[in-house]
Amino acid sequence: AELQHESFIFKGFRNVRTDASEIGNTLFSNACLPSTFFALKPGEHRLGPGMMAVRVLDSEGGRGLSAFFTRTTLKDLATNTVTTTVKPLPEGAPASFTGGVGVFLINAKPSTTELNIGDPISMDFEVTGIGNLRTMAAPVFSITDENWKIFDPAKTLTDEEDSDGIEPGIARFSQVIIPEFQANAIPSFELTYFNPINAEYV
């Protein structure tokens, strides 16, 4: 099955549920394919149609010996379209907001706690939770002076560890910082996200 839209990240199908139903004198197989998607921008969007290739029984059947065997035909099916409205995030987001929407926890580990002038420190962050880990950026250091050199963070997020909006996932960030003075402590950092359940920035 396939469903694409430039304004959404589509997480694919999972845990397909099947059952049967009878319509008239014909027995049909039903499949429910649940999924989730993450919006990239606000506004009204038309989602679909989704496309799916399925094998169906050949209604013409066969003649002679071939009638004893099941014949199938591959067909492309299209779903209906759905119009959805995505609300914009509230104004007043803190400067440390990096686009995360969901519920998250963060764990940080420095490569060393012995700080020396000019020695690099690698900060490893693990962000776990349910939400849009795919589009979330790294935590933000609360540094107001120029005595720290900060390098761009690297992000690691595999498809297997990504959150689908139902189950939690984990994203990893690694960032190098260098003190250019005799620092006594690693600078503080923040990960601010929007909690859609409480409708507030956390």
Predicted regions: what they are:
Residues 1-202:
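Regulatory and interaction patches adjacent to catalytic/ligand-binding sites
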